[in-house]
Amino acid sequence: MLKKDNDPLSAAEIVEFPIPEAQYEETIRALNGIQSGAVVEQDCFVADIGTAGCPALERLIGTMANVDELDWLGKQLESFDRYELLQFNAAVERFGLSAADELIDLSFRARDVTVVSDFTDLEKIGKRHYLTVHGACDPKELENLDGKETALALISGQPGYVTRYGVVYDNGIKLEQAYDRKHLPPIWMPESCIMELKLRATGKDDPKKQEWVQLPASRMKLERAMLRVGIASCGEMQMLVSDSRFPDEVNCALDFERESLFELNRLCQMCSNFKEQDFVKLGAVCQMAKPTCAANIRQLAENLDQFDFAP
């Protein structure tokens, strides 16, 4: 539940995070109606939170946040598995964090802490700790690891911090600022995303002054991302592709130096229900038809059924 301030008489809006793409513009307009939902400012007072999978988020209650920060955080946590959520919850309490921007920073390091909720299986504790510290290892190496010895070395060698989620061993991590409080950092790419772009103002190479957008997205979300980077129009913007589900034939047909972000978005919206074989077919059609821009490719995608294709 978000409000403009902590005044009990202030109007409130109930917002689901991450915000469903189809509801994004409606949500922002509703927040604007209660004088919150700004592009950069932390002007949303978190009056209440209901969350079953991540109770640590309740620490946000009573703080001010930006709506896109909360949306980003909700999306990031959506990608966490059960143990990663446990790590995040425990790390929030271990480091005493409560602000949305702090939690965004923590989301990049929470996977580096070891959390022990049950000390009865030292073998399992040791192997999980080893994976946490090393990120990954050869299955044979893990099988041959003495998990009990590794667990005992952890328990005797590090101070443990007791939280309601278990004992946290922080493995000496240092919390670093991944988020500069204005430009939202890159995030995992969900299956619904067709293309991920990095946006920055033309002629500006400052790595801190850039935004990542995932297409398709609502037009308002794209416009807000542009404003955070200081871009007033597509003509002032440089786009770099960081990931794409389109085949090479489509990507090579697009001139990202001249293409419109909004035309690219319309193309991705048109292809949002495509299966893998549809993308392959679109690539073959583009190879034959030689389109020169996103609008041309969108027209081909709209009429894909009119083409015969034998893969």
Tell me the role of every PLM-derived stretch.
Residues M1-E21, W188-R219:
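Short, extreme N-terminal segment that most often corresponds to the first beta-strand
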Residues T27-N144, K148-L152, G166-S192, K208, ...:
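Mixed-charge (acidic/basic) macromolecular-recognition segments
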Residues V162:
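Histidine-centered catalytic/metal-binding microenvironments
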